[in-house]
């Protein structure tokens, strides 16, 4: 199947947002129960923390930390595990650190046009003495706009 979600039968997500002045933060706790399609996998748990600082009306700095845990229950994004590698797509733990800069071309309508530039470091583990897991850097550039 081409299912790209967590692979869990049931998922619970608790999110929290807060802001004060130029600073805002988002947090999300996740739990997925009953992983399907991966032998030996049961449950997956995760956390996302994303503080954002508005530098100016046009610029915003973003940091994001993500972690996920579960016995062979964490499914890595396909951009980390392309078909030409020998890294497993399912791991026991994953941590990612994202640092980005957003540029709003129309700050009075922030969803109109946004330029994004970021770097991300991902480290993952498989609790096995023979298996290696993905650890590496990604560089992102994007243009987002809304009609």
Task: Kindly label every feature range from the protein language model.
Residues 2-147:
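Outer-membrane beta-barrel pore domains
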């Amino acid at each position: 199947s081409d299912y790209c979600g967590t692979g869990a039968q049931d998922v619970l997500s608790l999110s929290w947002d807060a802001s004060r002045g130029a600073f805002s933060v988002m947090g999300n706790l996740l739990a997925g129960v009953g992983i399907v399609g991966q032998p030996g996998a049961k449950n997956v748990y995760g956390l996302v923390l994303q503080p954002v600082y508005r530098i100016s009306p046009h610029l915003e700095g973003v940091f994001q930390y993500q972690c996920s845990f579960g016995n062979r229950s964490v499914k890595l994004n396909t951009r980390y595990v392309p078909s030409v590698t020998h890294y497993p797509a399912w791991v026991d733990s994953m941590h990612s650190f994202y640092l980005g800069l957003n540029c709003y071309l129309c700050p009075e309508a922030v969803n109109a046009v946004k330029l994004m530039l970021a770097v991300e470091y991902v480290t993952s583990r498989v609790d096995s003495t023979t298996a290696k897991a993905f650890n590496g850097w990604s560089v992102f550039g994007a243009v987002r706009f809304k009609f």
